Amino acid sequence: MSQDTKVKTTESSPPAPSKARKLLPVLDPSGDYYYWWLNTMVFPVMYNLIILVCRACFPDLQHGYLVAWLVLDYTSDLLYLLDMVVRFHTGFLEQGILVVDKGRISSRYVRTWSFFLDLASLMPTDVVYVRLGPHTPTLRLNRFLRAPRLFEAFDRTETRTAYPNAFRIAKLMLYIFVVIHWNSCLYFALSRYLGFGRDAWVYPDPAQPGFERLRRQYLYSFYFSTLILTTVGDTPPPAREEEYLFMVGDFLLAVMGFATIMGSMSSVIYNMNTADAAFYPDHALVKKYMKLQHVNRKLERRVIDWYQHLQINKKMTNEVAILQHLPERLRAEVAVSVHLSTLSRVQIFQNCEASLLEELVLKLQPQTYSPGEYVCRKGDIGQEMYIIREGQLAVVADDGITQYAVLGAGLYFGEISIINIKGNMSGNRRTANIKSLGYSDLFCLSKEDLREVLSEYPQAQTIMEEKGREILLKMNKLDVNAEAAEIALQEATESRLRGLDQQLDDLQTKFARLLAELESSALKIAYRIERLEWQTREWPMPEDLAEADDEGEPEEGTSKDEEGRASQEGPPGPE
């Protein structure tokens, strides 16, 4: 009995996770670990693409460092093998959800071309060393099949880097170097096949002083290949068929390479210009407009300086257009991370709901003011409030010179004018002149945007009005009597509105009752009309009466029976 109980307990307990499952978790293809592993795979792939072909074409390089090459070869093979293990533990997206089932991941991977290429790149071709010797690195050319991992790593880096255009240029230069490197190796191998020093085109005889060194051999071949592929010329003419074929192939490669380089560089420059146009407004159109309208030189200079300040200091005025392609929630998170700290410093917005602040940051409009420019003047109607992000603003007198105070970064003004506070003695008018001392970056929040957001947060609106009232009390800008009068007027208006609503409800009820009575009367009238029509159809026509008189009276019993049946049937009722 105890044994059975023990067996059942063992079967019902869940299996313990294996160590392999803990050590090899499923990687997210868009995560950091997978990204850094791709960057690690760049080294063995680049090693094989650059060093392997060089060892195959330069025997001195292969023979001089054989032990080092064998160590590096099998280290790269180990990384190739680990890369396949990583591929078996890299999830994939299915309907937007990351699949972490290792069985499904493995079955999906083995059905792709990547699996066969990875497997072919690890074929143990080195076993032929037993027959041909270790100085035949061409047996390892199948390692080139892992090159797609290099391209994938470059694509991921281009997406993540903060300087994508610079990375594209660096990647293009790397491709150019690899092509010239391969071509120089093939040139040296062809020269050795044809015979060193046989003519002016091939590599000189290594027996000559200075040409026997490995460094000289590679640099000469690289220089010769650069001259050919850049179509600079100044190279000895070919003398044999093999040399002609090599030159023709290089010229065709140079034409395609030149077109590729020009296209890539044009694309990079165009993308840079497009990005600048998206971030900063186009000043050429404004300059042309000012010239056509004969704007005075001083004002034109101020406009040009404003545009120059934006571009030099990387200021942006159209953040909404830049982030318009992001989903709404993601755009809100970006705006919150950038502007929430600034908005939370405003006194009337403190202790407000986080969701309210997230809605407000989407409404902030960045503005840049140049030196001496007025942000607002006394007596202007206040339709927005301002938050100082960077720079200094002065509260000046009407003469524009006398300064009463200086506002710095993090301060704000105009917040009272966008909140309808009862008893506000200044109303929605500006009470001071605000002028920018230098270039100032501000955030603008309009009354309409605030009203739109607060319509969904009535409690927050009440809290903000209370805070604004406290601020006005401290500033002695609140008329308590006027506030009480406005409150009484509002209550009276609301009472009248409630009365009108009640009267409207009563009228609607009476109208519905009258409409029902009208429909009932119409139904009764229709029934009576239908009954009259039925009765008129039963009456005999005058011609029928005359014929009946000529033929004689009908039998008395029959006539009475028919009249009785007609009176009993009656007219048909309404359907």
From Swiss-Prot:
GO cellular component: ciliary membrane; Golgi-associated vesicle membrane; intracellular cyclic nucleotide activated cation channel complex; non-motile cilium membrane; plasma membrane
UniProt membrane topology term: Multi-pass membrane protein
GO BP: calcium ion transport; monoatomic cation transmembrane transport; potassium ion transport; sensory perception of smell; sodium ion transport
Highest taxon listed in the record's lineage: Eukaryota
SMART domains per UniProt: cNMP (SM00100)
Binding residues for 3',5'-cyclic AMP: 430-431
Region (Disordered): 538-575
InterPro entries registered for this protein in UniProt: CLZ_dom, CNG_cation_channel, cNMP-bd_CS, cNMP-bd_dom, cNMP-bd_dom_sf, Ion_trans_dom, RmlC-like_jellyroll
Motif (IQ-type): 292-302
Transmembrane segments: 39-60, 71-91, 117-135, 141-159, 167-190, 214-248, 249-273
Region (C-linker): 274-350
Xref: Pfam families: CLZ (PF16526), cNMP_binding (PF00027), Ion_trans (PF00520)
Chain positions of site Central gate: 258
Cytoplasmic topological domain: 1-38, 92-116, 160-166, 274-575
Annotated catalysed reactions: Ca(2+)(in) = Ca(2+)(out); Na(+)(in) = Na(+)(out); K(+)(in) = K(+)(out); NH4(+)(in) = NH4(+)(out)
Coiled coil: 493-547
Region (Selectivity filter): 231-234
UniProt similarity note: Belongs to the cyclic nucleotide-gated cation channel (TC 1.A.1.5) family. CNGA4 subfamily.
Quaternary structure note: The olfactory cyclic nucleotide-gated channel is an heterotetramer composed of CNGA2, CNGA4 and CNGB1b subunits with 2:1:1 stoichiometry.
Domains: entry comment: The C-terminal coiled-coil domain mediates trimerization of CNGA subunits.
Physiological role: Pore-forming subunit of the olfactory cyclic nucleotide-gated channel. Operates in the cilia of olfactory sensory neurons where chemical stimulation of the odorant is converted to an electrical signal. Mediates odorant-induced cAMP-dependent Ca(2+) influx triggering neuron depolarization. The rise of intracellular Ca(2+) levels potentiates the olfactory response by activating Ca(2+)-dependent Cl(-) channels, but it also serves as a negative feedback signal to desensitize the channel for rapid adaptation to odorants.
Stated name of the protein: Cyclic nucleotide-gated channel alpha-4
Native source species: Homo sapiens (Human)
